Regions:
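Vicinal oxygen chelate
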Residues: 27-30, 91-138
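Exposed loop/turn and edge beta-strand positions of beta-sandwich/beta-sheet ligand-binding modules
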Residues: 48, 87, 128
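Short beta->alpha transition motifs characteristic of CBS
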Residues: 77, 125-127, 133, 144-151
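N-terminal beta-strand motif that seeds the catalytic metal site of vicinal oxygen chelate
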Residues: 1-30, 91, 150-165
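Short, solvent-exposed loop/turn elements at beta->coil junctions and helix N-caps
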Residues: 51, 78-80, 120-125
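Core segments of cupin and vicinal oxygen chelate
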Residues: 14-16, 23-72
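Helix-adjacent hinge/juxtasegments
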Residues: 76-95, 99-100
Length: 165
């Protein structure tokens, strides 16, 4: 089904300010937290039983946010994962270089059993990035990628639409 965009439409139906969160599930918050903090270098807080918020490190109350957009993952503990995820439904992290992706692959591969990581794919080039993908015991997929400056998302967005039906 193709949705036609009305020419001249200037006002969205829903007026939002920013994307603030995404949600995923785990069967074990403690295991997930350890992986998020020790493998992915994220900051975690559990405001109530069965709920954890995860974000990049570096933000203190009253300070400018570390990066924009700045959002969190909302992680819910559930007895089982009802809908296992596929690789295309992944959470991505930016690496500073291709060498950093290679280093991540080596370290994660060597320690995957300690963190409940069930699979780590060898680094490869895809869609202009160099990346590894890994999955945890909850079937959540994680990507660590490096993009050249002309292929970072801000540069791609500045180019605008490159494909039209």
């Amino acid at each position: 089904m193709n949705i036609q965009v009305k020419p001249g439409a200037t006002s969205p139906h829903v007026k939002t300010q920013s994307l603030v969160c995404g949600t995923l599930v785990t069967t074990d918050l403690k295991r997930a937290r350890r992986m998020y903090e020790e493998v992915l270098d994220m900051e975690c807080v559990e405001p109530e039983q069965g709920l954890m918020y995860v974000r990049e490190k570096g933000h203190q109350q009253g300070q400018a946010k570390h990066g924009k957009p700045y959002w969190v993952l909302e992680v819910r503990e559930t007895p089982e994962v009802a809908v296992p995820q596929e690789m295309l439904n992944h959470w991505g992290f930016e690496a500073p270089s291709q060498a950093a992706v290679d280093e991540a692959f080596a370290k994660v591969s060597a320690n995957k059993a300690d963190y409940g990581i069930t699979r780590v794919q060898k680094p490869f080039f895809r869609n202009g990035s160099y990346a590894i993908y890994m999955t945890d015991k909850d079937s959540n997929w994680w990507e660590v990628e490096y993009r050249t400056p002309d292929l970072i998302y801000t540069a791609l967005r500045e180019k605008g639409d490159q494909f039209q039906d």
